[in-house]
Amino acid sequence: MMGKCHCRDCQHISGGPFVPFVIVPTEAFRLMRGHLQYHFTESLKGGKHKRGFCANCGSRLTGAESDTPSPIVGLVAGSLDDPSWFRPQLDIFTSDAQPWDQMDPEIPKYEKYSPG
């Protein structure tokens, strides 16, 4: 799944109106070099959110719920070696979207998390 998260947390982290993300199975994710450093914050679901950052440059690379081992991980699309294939399929947390953010009217919108 590929989408854009418009929550205030993602706005703060990115310095922009949303974070473009790609959801992949955790076992399919492999860091090609270096290692991740993690930062934990309160999740919008009430638990903890685990963000992975490049230990060398500080770029945000991953995000996942951390209260339990997660079968999926969110990758920040702009951090991929080739993000040109990214095609958003949905917008989430549109209730937090900025009024000047021009969302694609052709993809589904969810006020909070997407169902499922």
Where are each of the predicted segments found?
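A short Gly-Trp-Pro
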Residues: 1-116
